[in-house]
Each structure stands twice: as structure tokens, then as C-alpha cells.
Amino acid sequence: MKILAIQNRMGIGDTVIFLPYIKAISEKFKVPVSLLVKENSKADQFLNQSNYIDKIILLERSKKKESRHNGIVGFFKLAKDLKKHKFDKIFIFNSSLRFFLIARLSGIKDIYQYPLFKKNNQHIVQPAIDLIKKNLSVEINSNPEIQLNINLINNAILKFNIKNEELNILLGIGGSESSKRI
């Protein structure tokens, strides 16, 4: 079985917020899940060690006219790109009619997504919680984890001279929109 999840929000933090839901899909169906994400999510750089992620597929869609998946031509290119993977199921983490139609055109049989046409002031995680609970009967602990290779962690400890006996502070600058507060 091959499963795709679409998370097309902009940044790293947006992608991280959805990891518990993607992991729940993987655990429910006992297969790693492929992700369709925007390049600026950097998912290909920080999720490449996650055992519940199969492939990272980049959505080439931006305000630049020459982006591969922009416009009506891009719509069909994306459908063609996804069709090659022969996905059985897709979880679309937004209310997009575009992605619903692309999934249909790609031949994906089982499509799960947020209710269509209900985007206004949509909270970032509540629809994901509802989607997973409704379709998988799974309660999610919204506590994202990123799997990292222990060697990378040890290299960072050495490089930045991190010591357990000292207070280490990490600032995570991110979204401030009310829809992104959890």
C-alpha cells in the first residue's frame, strides 16, 4: 500500500506541526507515508531520517510564473507526477478543491481531506485532529517529534560545545497568526 500526505503550508514549523498526524497514518496502515510539501518547508532536509516517511515530493508551486505546478498546466503536471507513484490513499491537510481534483485525476482511490470550502479562519491543527479521528478512529497527542541520527546530535554537541550541566536555550522563531496558535 502506498500513501501520500499533502501538507502545502509554507515553512518548517508548519510541517513539524503535522508530524503527529502523518505518523498516526503510518502507524495505522503499517507503511511509511510519502509527503508532498513545498520546497521551503525543508522537509527533505530534516525528515530524511524519519522511519515513518517514505519519499519527500516537492510541490513546485510559488508566486513565480515559471513554477512547474502553477496554473492549469501545472495542475495537470502535478497529477501526472503523482500518478507515476501509484498511491492508494491520500490525506490532504487542507480544504483544497484543486488537490482533491488532482488526486482523482492521479487515480488515487481513497481520498481523505478537510471539508471543502471551509478555509476561513481555520485553526492549524483542529481540522487535522478531526480528519484523523473521523477516518482512522485515532486520538492524537499533538506532540511533534523529529527523528535524528545520533551521530548528527553528537556532532552538534561537539560543534556548539553544549554541556548538560549548563542551561541551554533555543529560540524557535515562528508564526504569530492566531490560526497557528496551539
Name the predicted role of every residue range.
Residues 1-182:
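Catalytic machinery of carbohydrate-active enzymes
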